[in-house]
Amino acid sequence: MKKFKDNIDDFFKWVKGSELVELDDIDVSEDPVRPELTLGFRIIHGRKIFGLKYNEEIEAIVCIALCPEVPHTVREMDYMSQAANQDGKRGEIVVAYTVWSRKRGAGKQTIFITKKLVKDEMKNINRFITLSPLTPIATHFHIKHGAKLININATSQNFEYDFN
């Protein structure tokens, strides 16, 4: 019983001590969801990379784009985020298009902290959507953490996290 309690205490210690930081460089080959997307793709046209940092280590990564509509493909997201960032405009929807973790529980924590950051600091944003692969793992992850399935597309699915 003590070992279990120690494991729980260790888990909550790292969760409480973690912070979300913006990254300008990652090893994209580590991305199990979209390794084909270059670093350059991930940091232009209002797209951002965030990492969940704990004890100087990045435990999870999420890549987001700002879009005016819900994209059904990476290509649509690319066009939408470019259009949303012309002439100082911004999209009203945050699209999390990849998330992965190096530590159990870090993916969930990253989604929730990113959602909070967006809600608190990006006042023009009114929705938090995913552009997820059509895999049981992605479906289970998002449903388990409270997202609602809003679209099933030919090559992807969209989930929406409540913004309240």
Question: What feature does the model see in each segment?
Answer:
Residues 1-23, 164:
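Conserved N-terminal entry element of GNAT/NAT acetyltransferase domains
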Residues 17-37:
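Conserved GNAT-fold acetyl-CoA-binding loop/helix
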Residues 38-60, 65-72:
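A short helix-loop-beta-strand connector motif used in the catalytic cores of GNAT acetyltransferases and
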Residues 41, 117-125, 129-134:
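Preference for well-ordered, secondary-structure-rich cores of eukaryotic proteins
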Residues 63-94:
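Conserved acyl-donor/pantetheine-binding loop and adjacent beta-alpha core of acyl/acetyltransferases
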Residues 101, 128-140, 153-160:
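Conserved beta-strand-loop-alpha-helix junction that forms the acyl-donor binding cleft
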Residues 101-119:
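Conserved acetyl-CoA-binding loop-helix of GNAT-fold acetyltransferases
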Residues 143-153:
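Conserved acetyl-CoA-binding loop of GNAT-fold acetyltransferases
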